[in-house]
Every structure is written in C-alpha cells, then in structure tokens.
C-alpha cells in the first residue's frame, strides 16, 4: 500500500524532526476515523532511528500493534509497544522488585484507618476523646466511596507531581470538575472530606514500594522519580483520551533534548473524561510541547454519503475519492 500525501507529510516531518531541522520535536497528528492511523504509525516507526515506544490505550490494542511491528520485521528490542501502565510498571519494578499489585489498595488503607480509630475510641482516656474518634471513624466509613473516587482521580491527575497533593484548592477543583459532591447523599464538611482524601493519598504514596494499584503504575514512577530507559521516540495512540499522569510519563520516557513525541488522536472522539482524561488533551500537549500539527482526515472506511453526514460534527473529514456513494 502506497502512502497518501498526508501520510507522506508525517513521514517527512519525522525525518526532519529527528535530524534537528525543525524548531520542535513534538507533533500532534489529528487522525479522524478510518483515515489509516495505524498504517501511518507503522510507516513512521520504520523511518525513525533509535529506540522507540508506542503507547496504546489498552492491552488489546497494544497486542495488535506488537503483532504488526513483528510482521514489519521490526526488532521488539528496538521498538516496543504496550500501555503506559505497563511502561510505568516496568520502571517501578526496577526500584521495588517485590512490589505487589492490589486493586483495592485504597480501600485497604481506609479500612485500616477506621479500625485504628475504633481501637483508639475503645482505649481513649476520656469519653470526649472516645466520641471524637468514633465520629472520625463514622465519617471515614461514610465517605469511603467518595474518597476512593477522589484519590483515584487525583492519581490520574498526577497530584504530587504537577503540584503538591496537600494543596486543598486543587482537591476542590477536582471535586467540582468531576461532580463528586453530587454523589454524596448527605451534607458533609467538605474541608474535613478533603483532609481525609489528602491523608489517604499520602498514606498510599508511602506504601508504593510494597503495594500499588492500577493508578500507581503510572504515578509511582513520576512522584518517586524512577529512572526510565530513555527513548529516541515515543508515539502515543488515542492521545485525545490521555490524562495528566499518562502524558507526564510519556514525556519522561523521552531522551532529553533529542527525543521525539508524536501524539496521535481525534479530539472529536474524546469520550473518557469521566475516567480522568482531559477533553482538550491534544490542545494541552500542543501547549506544553509547542507541537506541530498535521492532519489525517481522508477516511478509507466510510461511503461518501456517510461522510457528508459526519461533516456536520467533524467538518474536515473527507471521503476518499474511491469511496462508494452509499446510502444513509
């Protein structure tokens, strides 16, 4: 299959960026649905020199990309593919060799806190102190679901790396942005709730060498500054669905000054905001890295009639000249 003019432009950009001919080493590739994104990624990987990593959104896509890399004859020791979680986990295991993955890590921490407060209430010197401990235990138990959501989102937002995790204003912003307060079925002291979140978050970080959860796989290498094996290039697939922690880890993987980052995605398909992703993730990448932008907007998947309807929402998508007319 020959390269289209748009795909060839991506290849030329990669060559020029790696040879130092451009003022930036980052590219936002805006790839609309059915426009040959994966084919372009593979072709770009073939011309880039040195060691690289392709970051897939999930394991299934990572396995698909790995198979295509092998079919292209690319050495997996030179160009690897995986999720950013797997990349973070590999880096973290070099620091914490015996670390265990525990999905319910935060729940375990909350349960331990409640048990400790109950014990203190039972052994308190005065009835007043006992009541205070019992009240704190009740609050922690009541807010368990809220705290678990908030702490998970805070990890995905890279609290403790992009800013202090003890900054209460950032927690209030997170709570408002994701509508977490709406999940509460009763009135609570939000200052107290945030202080509880901070305590649980801090405790979780302190246990990272022994126990990590899914969110920690990315946050731990960032917050503890784990050494990454530096790459000459990193390609991020589905970049429109990245959160601050994923983006920070991808950047951390690059060789300083010479590493190239290509963020591939479709802002029109940014649908994972509820998981901590930014709806404007690609704009944020461009702002942070001063990225160039190139399009992949000629779709090979859809008939012209379907594309005409889709243009109501994505005006720049175009049907390939060989596409059938189709019926909507």
Predicted regions and their residues:
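A basic- and aromatic-enriched beta-loop-alpha substructure that forms the phosphate/nucleotide-
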Residues: 88-153, 159
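Conserved helicase motor core of SF1/SF2 NTP-dependent helicases
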Residues: 29-41, 47, 57-64, 85, ...
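Accessory N-terminal region flanking or inserted into the helicase ATPase core
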Residues: 1-12, 16, 21-30, 40, ...
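P-loop NTPase Walker
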Residues: 1-100
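A generic structural signal for alpha->beta connector loops
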Residues: 51, 76-78, 230, 258, ...
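Short, well-ordered alpha-helices that flank and scaffold nucleotide-derived cofactor binding pockets
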Residues: 16, 43-50, 67-71, 219-226, ...
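Phosphate/oxyanion-binding loops and surfaces in catalytic or ligand/nucleic-acid-binding neighborhoods
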Residues: 72, 94, 149, 153-157, ...
């Amino acid at each position: 299959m020959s390269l289209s003019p748009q795909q060839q432009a991506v290849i030329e950009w990669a060559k020029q960026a790696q040879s130092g001919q451009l003022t930036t080493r980052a590219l936002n590739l805006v790839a609309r649905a059915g426009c040959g994104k994966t084919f372009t990624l593979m072709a770009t990987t073939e011309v880039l020199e040195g060691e690289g990593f392709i970051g897939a959104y999930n394991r299934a896509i990572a396995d698909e990309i790995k198979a295509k890399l092998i079919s292209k004859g690319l050495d997996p020791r030179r160009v690897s593919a995986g999720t950013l979680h797997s990349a973070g986990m590999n880096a973290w295991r070099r620091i914490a060799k015996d670390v265990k993955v525990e999905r319910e890590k935060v729940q375990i921490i909350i349960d331990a806190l409640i048990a400790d407060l109950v014990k203190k209430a039972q052994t308190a010197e005065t009835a007043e102190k006992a009541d205070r401990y019992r009240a704190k235990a009740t609050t922690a138990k009541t807010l368990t679901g809220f705290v678990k959501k908030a702490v998970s989102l805070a990890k995905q937002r890279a609290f403790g790396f992009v800013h202090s995790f003890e900054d209460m204003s950032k927690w209030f912003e997170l709570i408002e942005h994701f509508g977490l307060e709406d999940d509460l079925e009763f009135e609570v002291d939000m200052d107290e709730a945030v202080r509880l979140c901070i305590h649980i978050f801090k405790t979780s970080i302190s246990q990272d060498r022994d126990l990590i959860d899914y969110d920690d796989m990315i946050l731990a290498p960032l917050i503890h500054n784990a050494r990454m094996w530096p790459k000459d290039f990193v390609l991020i697939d589905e970049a429109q669905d990245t959160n601050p922690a994923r983006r920070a880890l991808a950047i951390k993987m690059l060789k300083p000054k010479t590493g190239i980052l290509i963020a591939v995605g479709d802002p029109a398909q940014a649908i994972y905001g509820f998981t901590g992703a930014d709806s404007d993730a690609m704009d944020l990448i461009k702002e942070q890295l001063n990225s160039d932008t190139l399009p992949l907007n000629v779709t090979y998947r859809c008939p012209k009639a379907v594309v005409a309807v889709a243009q109501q929402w994505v005006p720049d998508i175009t049907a390939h000249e060989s596409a059938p007319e189709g019926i909507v």
